Amino acid sequence: MAIGLVGRKVGMTRIFTEDGTSIPVTVIEATPNRVTQLRTEESDGYRALQVTAGTKKANRINKAEAGHFAKAGVEAGRTLVEFRLEENEGADIEVGSEITVEIFNDTKKIDVTGTSKGKGFQGAIKRWNFSSQRMTHGNSLSHRAPGSIGQNQSPGKVFKGKKMAGQLGNKQVTTQSLEVVRVDVENGLILVKGAVPGATGNDVIVKPAVKA
């Protein structure tokens, strides 16, 4: 897994190419990520890089977190994220150093992970894209009902995983192979073509695309 960044979804806008083509983009603010820990094969059984981003009020930090950040010599952040490292990756990175959007200067496509917008309890039509039943012609009660959910006495149960009504959204989602339109190192911004998961202001994890 490649090294990535923790950013924040600012919102969507559009930019124009030289020939006047409009490109919809999502703006991701990725302030410098501070390295809080380096996990090693010897002590942890795997190699990884742990970073934090943003800030957090001192009265919102417990003693364990405060000690962890103090040991790394960095300001307390709002989240902790790990990126797995390959065998020879991250050799020049030290605890307390910073990682900026510069790492994406030569990257053409990225994967963005975030928490999708929560929609609450939704029916099978909205949640699973089921077709609705007839609005008339004898149907007076089951317009948006899912239909049959099983068989008869055999097997005599509803199988696990059956698509039914329930909680929609508020899940971790990764959108893959999004095109990087622009990287603004000075302002710590990444402009990505298209939409990314989550609401405006949510944290997102940006990594080089796996399927690039």
From Swiss-Prot:
It comes from the Bacteria. One of its GO terms (molecular function) is structural constituent of ribosome. It comes from Alteromonas mediterranea (strain DSM 17117 / CIP 110805 / LMG 28347 / Deep ecotype). Gene3D superfamilies: 3.30.160.810, Translation factors. InterPro entries: Ribosomal_uL3 (IPR000597), Ribosomal_uL3_bac/org-type (IPR019927), Ribosomal_uL3_CS (IPR019926), Transl_B-barrel_sf (IPR009000). GO terms for biological process: translation. Methylated by PrmB. Keywords: Methylation, Ribonucleoprotein, Ribosomal protein, RNA-binding, rRNA-binding. One of the primary rRNA binding proteins, it binds directly near the 3'-end of the 23S rRNA, where it nucleates assembly of the 50S subunit. The gene is rplC. HAMAP family: Ribosomal_uL3_B (MF_01325_B). Part of the 50S ribosomal subunit. Forms a cluster with proteins L14 and L19. GO terms for cellular component: cytosolic large ribosomal subunit. The modification N5-methylglutamine is found at Q153. Residues 135-161 are annotated as: Disordered. This is Large ribosomal subunit protein uL3. Pfam families: Ribosomal_L3 (PF00297). PROSITE patterns: RIBOSOMAL_L3. Belongs to the universal ribosomal protein uL3 family.
